[in-house]
């Protein structure tokens, strides 16, 4: 199935990214980074950027003899600004809506979330709130 999800590279490296690289299917992966750090810790940024680039290469470089491959796209921002971050968020909102239409899924209907809330309030002995 289709999944639109993300995580920080360092936190996801030993779980989600490993599943993407070594899993049993092909997938499309987007990695996003900025060419300009949003802080003054140059060495920290240098390591994070190297991590992102190495992760991109590792996600593409699956066993060439195997039946699966990953298509990895990198979105490189020149800097993280409210405008650029908003544009990236809008792009993924649009992607989620379009994929929902393509797969005949309503991404705005969340019966699982509603069921969770109903169960949680019941366990807490509280009435449901809207």
Where are these regions (language model features)?
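A SIS-like phosphosugar-recognition module
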Residues: 1-130
